[in-house]
């Protein structure tokens, strides 16, 4: 919020749970009294029983992002879900799921043999291996090479104990 004030920026949340109304415990949503008149987007947008996925987030958050850019506003994208951030900022395309995926009945070991030797995919995560192989099949380049916006990415970390202390404090305040 301090940075947003200094930059005259608005904030877009990229957290997969802050987008839901009434999910206040464990999500570290900014409270209205904490915003200091800084506009926050993509918080409390959907009902908890809505079926929201990263594609829907991408569509809705990009509308906000593009609208703010047209107004020449500075923007801070803040939050916890790397996939949501990538989907928002990169040319991240979603394929329609196929009912008869040729990789469905293959074991992880069989799939690993199909990977190029220099691939950086997590070879122990079957879902990621399958997704990588599907991209190879369809000639899809890595999203990271296709930035849609000019941006700086800053990652912040905290000591694990400090994180847990803050979580406990928030729970106690509720």
Where do the language-model regions lie?
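Phosphate/pyrophosphate-binding catalytic cores of soluble transferases and nucleic-acid-acting enzymes
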Residues: 1-174
